[in-house]
Every structure is written in structure tokens, then in C-alpha cells.
């Protein structure tokens, strides 16, 4: 009996998700959370009742090796599923598990779409999550609540897999809200720190704005197409009166979840969470959810060039803003955070020029080297007693050779060095941009941002491999832990091989014609960036910049000052004035008691003015009244 490859792929994929969902409940038997502040920001979900441990004491159970083994097994199964799919030419599989409300006009069902996007993301996501989970066992070992860390971590990955596999708006919304809620829990893991609590709340608020866009899209899609199936919504193009609002909802949703310009401040602030959370958040889960949604629905944009232009300019602006801000930062986690925002902008710009496949290609390659960068940072920060200032990490390569080598490799991949993961996807995006007839401004912004990426990436390498040693001799530096080394080496292999493997066996490069000059554009951009950083490092060491442009980039284009301070203060004052004018001086004064008193006084004064005691005015008014009455009577009788 011959087994259909599609059956094997679908069985493996659904089994992986089912095993992950069930095994998460065994990732931790410790539900004790340390005392938290009594406020909404530091709210935590407690599972003491589920653990049958009313005293909240930590149970003597270590779930780290079990969680790592589960993720390792599932990662290997996902790779097998991916290889079978490659041999089967990535035939899309649409699974419908059950139908709800069959007697209703709207087709509400649970659908999964196992296509090229999901099957590749399944492998990439599980490999990256496995590596980060293994690193977490080393990093969170001293945390008093570290045993409970693996459960929300696993739930985070599961919700992202639900989001990427779902073909039903119901499941899309479930996964979308799941990663949002769990990001709040993980960012505020150290909730006794005010910065962590406020950062988690900031992430929720900005993502709520994006959720408005997704709900708008879902509502109008169901209203116009009478279906919850995403494929049917895209195939049966909605009514033209609503499609523009649907596209606006998609753009707003992607901007909120993927931290595009205007809704970006939450992403750098999320660095207050544990480093494994930052690694998972920035590499293969929440921040790429918005981009993935645009990739899934990119066909809706094909007939609306203005919408594509908005997406392109938004992505280019985000990439330029984040890259220009990163070059002026000294907090190494903030530098990598802004680099994530810049790369997300590049992905969105790729969708804007009509290349969603290239955007997804960059999602997959970016996941490996960005996760590796964060794990390297976590190792360095952990060894330097939570020191995050890049200028105080000079000479770290002599003390941590493996970590420094992986950090340099990740930075080189980020800047697009040939034959590393980032080169293959960024090269194709820049070539496609130069060959497209899309908005020139958006393309130019993306190219300049790519050049600046080289600047801040090489800046990290320069300080880490500097001959000067600014590290405290008391820092407990060491690389003896196998969980750290194995995770870094695994991701480094992905950084080296993933771009080549994906470009040759997974993705079919888009067909477009470029001139030799345009073909050399990516390499030229990298060379220009290296030239800029060399000149800057040689000149700025003795001539520090004190200019408006430097202040602008250091202060994030004054965005936070304007939006969080000026606009907030202005809106508060105007709303206070309006409410005071409407309520205190409105209903309660002008229209209320004082208004009645003023009206009565005015009527009384008018009545008094008419009764001044002059006989001639009384006689004149009587004659006028008699004349008017007589005239009207004559007119009526005649």
C-alpha cells in the first residue's frame, strides 16, 4: 500500500502541534509565584489551585530537561515533514476538523492550511524555540521562579504555530491574541521591577491598537464574503466599498504587532524582560505575526497600488528610523531591538513591492541569526553582572571566544555579508526593489536603512574584538555550560546554511530583470556602510558629535517625547478643558442653576424696563395696538 506524502505531512504536522499542546502541561509542576505588587501592571496568573498546593510552595520537580527533550523531538519531526514536503513540491493541504452552526448562513469552521509558509515556519520556529529553551535552562537557573518559566514559553510557541497554520479567522484571532497575552506575562516576568511592569503594559496598549485593525478586517470580511475561511475571503474579492477599509485594518494590525513606525515604542521597551523572552519574541514569534498576516493576505493588495505604496513607505520609514536610532544607542540590547524593528520594516517594504515570498524568506533567515544574537547578548550580560553598556564590553572576545565568534557571525549575517543567512534574503529584496516600478521614496528609505544596518552591526563587532579591555576582573565569565554552547552552535549552523538551503530547495526566486549595476547594489550598500563606520570610529574617538542630527537619533527622533509627553499632555489639557466647559461651566453653571438665575434676571430687567411710569408711552403703545388690531380686522372682513 502506497501512502500519500500529503497524508504523512498532515499527520506529522498536526501530531507535532498536539504533542506540544499536551506536553506543555508537564513542562512545570511549580506554580509558585513570588509576591507581586498590588497593582494591575504586575498582575500574574496563579495556578496554585491546579497544583493542589494551596500554600504556594515550590515543588521539587525540574522540568527543564523534559521540555528540552520534547522540543528537540518535535524539531526533528518537523524537519522530516519539511523534507517530505520538498519532495512533494509543497502541495497545500487544507484540513477541516469540524463545522459549527451548520444551519447559519455564515460558514464557521476550524480550518488548517498546511502550505509552504506553515511547513517551513514550523521547522524554523521549533528549531529556534528548542535552542532558546535550552539556553533558558542555563540562563534562568538562578531565578526563584525559573521552574515555572517553561510553561508560558511553550504556550507562546504553540499560539504562534496556531496563527501560522490557521485558515480560519477564528483561529487567526485565537493565535493573535494568544501571543499578545503571553508576551505581557513574559515581558513582566520580573514584575517586581517597575520597568518590566510598565514595559509589559506599554506592549499591551500598543498591540490593542493593532487588534482594532484585525477586528475591523475580520468584521468586514465576514460581512462582505459571508465566510470565516481566509482562502475564500481572498479568492472571493470583497465589495469595493469595504475592501479599502479591510486593507486599512490589515495595515494597522501589522503595524501594531510588528512594531512599525508610529506603533513601535513597545518593542525596545520589551527588552526589560528576560533575555530568552527577547530572543523568542524578536526571532520567530510575536513580532513577525503582523508581517506573516500581510504575507497571507498579500493577494488582496494586488489590485490596489495605493495600498501597496502605503505599505512600502511605512516599511521603508520604519527601517530607516530604527536603523538611524540603533547607531546612536549604547545599550546593546536596545541596539539589537532596533535592528529587529529595522528588519521588520524591510520585510514590510518587500510586501509593498509585491514580493511576499521574499518577505517570508527574510523571516526565516532572520530567525536564526537574530535568536543567536540575543543568546550571545544574554551570555555576555549574564557574565558581566547585568552590564548592558556596549562600551564596557571591550575585549570580551578574549574571555568568551565561542560567544564572541557567534556574536560576530550574527552581526555579519545581519549586515548581509555574502554566503551567510541574511545575505540571500536581503540581496533578493534589494534587487527586487531596484527592479520594481514602485514608489521610489520607499525604496530609497529601505536602501539607506540597509546601509545603516552595516554601521551598527560592525560597531558591535568592533567593540567586542577591541584590543582594549574594559571588563571588570571580578566578572564571573565562563562558557563551560553545555546548554549555552549547544544552543549557540546549533543556531550558528542555521545562520551559515539556512540561506543557501532555502534559496536552493525551498523558494523559487522571483523572475525580474536587473542591470549589472543593480545586481551589485547589495554589495555596494554593505561596502558604503563599512566605509562610514571606519571613518566614524577613527574620527569620533577624538571629535565627539554634538549636533541636532545626533540628538535626534539618540532621542529616537523625539518620537517618545512628542507622543508620550507633548501629545498626551495636550490631549489631557484639551479634554480637561472640554469636560470643564461642558460639565462644570455648562450643565452645572450656564445651563443649570446659574443659567436659570441669569435668564430670570434678564427677563425681570426687561419687564422692569417696560414699566417706567411715563403716561405718554402708555398712550402711544395703546394707540399703536388699537391701530394694528383695526387694520387686521379690516383686512379680514374685506
UniProtKB/Swiss-Prot annotation:
Pfam families: NADH5_C (PF06455), Proton_antipo_M (PF00361), Proton_antipo_N (PF00662)
Reaction catalyzed: a ubiquinone + NADH + 5 H(+)(in) = a ubiquinol + NAD(+) + 4 H(+)(out)
An example Gene Ontology CC term for this record: mitochondrial inner membrane
Primary localisation category: mitochondrion
GO biological process, one term: electron transport coupled proton transport
EC number per UniProt: 7.1.1.2
Membrane-spanning intervals of the chain: 7-27, 66-86, 112-132, 169-189, 203-223, 242-262, 275-295, 307-327, 335-354, 365-385, 404-424, 445-465, 487-507, 520-540, 618-638
Subcellular location(s) per record: Mitochondrion inner membrane
GO terms assigned for molecular function: NADH dehydrogenase (ubiquinone) activity
Protein keywords: Electron transport, Membrane, Mitochondrion, Mitochondrion inner membrane, NAD, Respiratory chain, Translocase, Transmembrane, Transmembrane helix, Transport, Ubiquinone
Topology in membrane: Multi-pass membrane protein
Keyword Mitochondrion listed: yes
NCBIfam families: NDH_I_L
Main function: Core subunit of the mitochondrial membrane respiratory chain NADH dehydrogenase (Complex I) that is believed to belong to the minimal assembly required for catalysis. Complex I functions in the transfer of electrons from NADH to the respiratory chain. The immediate electron acceptor for the enzyme is believed to be ubiquinone.
Family: Belongs to the complex I subunit 5 family.
Name of the molecule in the record: NADH-ubiquinone oxidoreductase chain 5
Organism (species): Paracentrotus lividus
Lineage of the organism: Eukaryota, Metazoa, Echinodermata, Eleutherozoa, Echinozoa
Amino acid at each position: 500500500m502506497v501512502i500519500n506524502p500529503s497524508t504523512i505531512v498532515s499527520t506529522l504536522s498536526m501530531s507535532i502541534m498536539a504533542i506540544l499542546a499536551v506536553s506543555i502541561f508537564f513542562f512545570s509542576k511549580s506554580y509558585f509565584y513570588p509576591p507581586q505588587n498590588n497593582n494591575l501592571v504586575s498582575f500574574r496568573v496563579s495556578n496554585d489551585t491546579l497544583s493542589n498546593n494551596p500554600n504556594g510552595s515550590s515543588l521539587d520537580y525540574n522540568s527543564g530537561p523534559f521540555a528540552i527533550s520534547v522540543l528537540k523531538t518535535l524539531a526533528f519531526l518537523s524537519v522530516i515533514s519539511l523534507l517530505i514536503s520538498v519532495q512533494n513540491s509543497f502541495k497545500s493541504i487544507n484540513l477541516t476538523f469540524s463545522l459549527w452552526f451548520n444551519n447559519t448562513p455564515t460558514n464557521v469552521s476550524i480550518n488548517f492550511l498546511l502550505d509552504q509558509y506553515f511547513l517551513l515556519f514550523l521547522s524554523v520556529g521549533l528549531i529556534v524555540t528548542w535552542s532558546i529553551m535550552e539556553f533558558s535552562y542555563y540562563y534562568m537557573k538562578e531565578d526563584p521562579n525559573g521552574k515555572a518559566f517553561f510553561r508560558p514559553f511553550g504556550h507562546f510557541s504553540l499560539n504562534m504555530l496556531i496563527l501560522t497554520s490557521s485558515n480560519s479567522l477564528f483561529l487567526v484571532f485565537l493565535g493573535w491574541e494568544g501571543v499578545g497575552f503571553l508576551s505581557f506575562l513574559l515581558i513582566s516576568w520580573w514584575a517586581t521591577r517597575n520597568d518590566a511592569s510598565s514595559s509589559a503594559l506599554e506592549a499591551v496598549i500598543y498591540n490593542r491598537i493593532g487588534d482594532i485593525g484585525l477586528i475591523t478586517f475580520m468584521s468586514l470580511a465576514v460581512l462582505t464574503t459571508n465566510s470565516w475561511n481566509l482562502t475564500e475571503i481572498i479568492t472571493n474579492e470583497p465589495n469595493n466599498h469595504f475592501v479599502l477599509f479591510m486593507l486599512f485594518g490589515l495595515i494597522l494590525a501589522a503595524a501594531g504587532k510588528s512594531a512599525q513606525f508610529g506603533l513601535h515604542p513597545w518593542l525596545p521597551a520589551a527588552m526589560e524582560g528576560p533575555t530568552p523572552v527577547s530572543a523568542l519574541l524578536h526571532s520567530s514569534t510575536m513580532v513577525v505575526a503582523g508581517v506573516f498576516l500581510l504575507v497571507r493576505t498579500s493577494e488582496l493588495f494586488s489590485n490596489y497600488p495605493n495600498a501597496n505604496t502605503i505599505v512600502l513607505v511605512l516599511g521603508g520609514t520604519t527601517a530607516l528610523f530604527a536603523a538611524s536610532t540603533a547607531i546612536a544607542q549604547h545599550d546593546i540590547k536596545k541596539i539589537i531591538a532596533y535592528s529587529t524593528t529595522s528588519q521588520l520594516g524591510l520585510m514590510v517594504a518587500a510586501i509593498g513591492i509585491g514580493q511576499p515570498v521574499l518577505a517570508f524568506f527574510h523571516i526565516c533567515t532572520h530567525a536564526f541569526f537574530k535568536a543567536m544574537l540575543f543568546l550571545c547578548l544574554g551570555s555576555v550580560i549574564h557574565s558581566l553582572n547585568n552590564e548592558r553598556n556596549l562600551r564596557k564590553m571591550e575585549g570580551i572576545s578574549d574571555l568568551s571566544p565561542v560567544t564572541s565568534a557567534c556574536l560576530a557571525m550574527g552581526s555579519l549575517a545581519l549586515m548581509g555579508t555574502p554566503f551567510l543567512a541574511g545575505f540571500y534574503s536581503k540581496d533578493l529584496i534589494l534587487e527586487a526593489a531596484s527592479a520594481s516600478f514602485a514608489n521610489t521614496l520607499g525604496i530609497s528609505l529601505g536602501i539607506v536603512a540597509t546601509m545603516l544596518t552595516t554601521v551598527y552591526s560592525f560597531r558591535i563587532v568592533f567593540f567586542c574584538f577591541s584590543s582594549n579591555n574594559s571588563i571588570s576582573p571580578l566578572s564571573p565569565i565562563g562558557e563551560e555550560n553545555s546548554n549555552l554552547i549547544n544552543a549557540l552552535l546549533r543556531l550558528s549552523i542555521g545562520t551559515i546554511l539556512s540561506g543557501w538551503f532555502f534559496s536552493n530547495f525551498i523558494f523559487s526566486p522571483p523572475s525580474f530583470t536587473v542591470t549589472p549595476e543593480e545586481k551589485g547594489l547589495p554589495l555596494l550598500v554593505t561596502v558604503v556602510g563599512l566605509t562610514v563606520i571606519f571613518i566614524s570610529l577613527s574620527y569620533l574617538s577624538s571629535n565627539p558629535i554634538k549636533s541636532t542630527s545626533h540628538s535626534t537619533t539618540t532621542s529616537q527622533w523625539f518620537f517618545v517625547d512628542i507622543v508620550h509627553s507633548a501629545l498626551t499632555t495636550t490631549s489631557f489639557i484639551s479634554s480637561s478643558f472640554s469636560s470643564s466647559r461642558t460639565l462644570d461651566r455648562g450643565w452645572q453653571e450656564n445651563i443649570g442653576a446659574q443659567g436659570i438665575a441669569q435668564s430670570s434676571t434678564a427677563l425681570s430687567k426687561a419687564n422692569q424696563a417696560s414699566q417706567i411710569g411715563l403716561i405718554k408711552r402708555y398712550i402711544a403703545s395703546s394707540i399703536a395696538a388699537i391701530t394694528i388690531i383695526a387694520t387686521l380686522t379690516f383686512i379680514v372682513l374685506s
